[in-house]
Amino acid sequence: MFKTIKKIKYFYVFLIIFLFLIFLLSRGCVYDKKDLSYGVTFSLKQAESLGLDWQETYISILNDLKVKKIRLAAYWDEIESEKDNYGWDDLDWQIKKASEANAEIILAVGGRLPRWPECHFPKWIENIPQAEKNKQLLEYIELTINRHKNNKNIVAWQVENEPFLINFGECPKLDKGLLDMEIALVKSLDNRPIVVTDSGELSAWVPAARRADIFGTTMYRDTYSKLLRSYVHYPIEPGFFRFKKNITRLFSSPEKWVVIELQAEPWGPVPFQELPKKERDITMSLDKFKDMIDFSRKTGFKEFYLWGVEWWYWEWKVNGDGRFWEEAGKLF
């Protein structure tokens, strides 16, 4: 009996210590609203999939919303849709217009970049040996960096997008050695910081953060699970992200931490433009939008890139609902 009591004592001591450690590790700075900054991710592909004039949308983002931080993607399948035949016009134009608006640019390069299907490889690489694929990938990255590295508005290079998020997207298995080669290549070409990103809810962060000058996390609360065939609300509080940040800091030392993808659009079993408004509202209504902004402010981050600017514009121009566009405009 005494042994049982002793075991129970040890258990409670361990539990108290464990809970105390969680309390300590979930602490962190919560910045004042005036210290926060916001940007967006823009995808030409996403704008086109919504039936929008992507250039008109982009100009409105810069001139009407007055966004001063923007993440752009150098999609390999668009830049080099045919081997050695490069089409730079669209990316050049996006960078030029953002620079004219004096916006800071994060330029993402690699095979895996923002927006579905996650990986954006040109079709011509499908039937060539893996070693040659890797060589061609590095060549496209080198050409992209060299073409744009003299632009002072580019503040960082993002290498790949959520490379450690497995089982999501139509992507090959992660090759860590290749990822490290990509990062080393970009560092050899330019001294601006490297952004490496990871899933906020589904990944461990440490492998990505160890490779990053700037670590970027995603932040979602309402999604659709194909596995469960239902909508899912993550039962997490802002302290969850502070906890992960503090744990990750024990094993890595990025110079900067940002929320690179803050949910600000719906997520459903099919593309959201195919869903009725009532179903879109399940994962992103105006109230959820406001709540997400308030939630994110308490997570211990101070720089956020919202995910969904093309959707706000689509709601406004196609559906006559300008509320999201107007609400987002208050942040910039």
Predicted regions and their residues:
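Surface-exposed, active-site-proximal loop segments in enzymatic domains
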Residues: Y75-D89, L113-K133, P163-C171, G268-K278, ...
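Substrate-binding cleft of secreted/luminal carbohydrate-active enzymes
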Residues: V155, V258-L331
